[in-house]
């Protein structure tokens, strides 16, 4: 049709090689590889999201997705906030989900299942929901960043 959708994973598998992915086609490996390899992407995402024309319903306007530690670019999935950053220590001790972070697909599936089927406080359920939204938003942004990078290569 006129608006066919393209699976970026297929594009990556067929046409993209980056040694920083260590042979993986996973978005969790491709995103950090792109951040390490592209000066265009580095320059753009080293700024707060509000200054590069991005809005967010789940992150503050001053969120920066490109951070370095000891000269190395950090994986943005490791920048996702702790699941219970808005809870007190006492509230954390009474949580039932036994999750720390939602920063990969397995944790996201587990978290979603737990909020569906576990009896937990509304506050814990809300925190897990927020963590899922943040994770999904970063996944979406990762696809945008990868697409932007691919556009610079053609």
Q: What does each model-found stretch correspond to?
A:
Residues 1-154:
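DEDD superfamily 3′-5′ metal-dependent exonuclease/proofreading module
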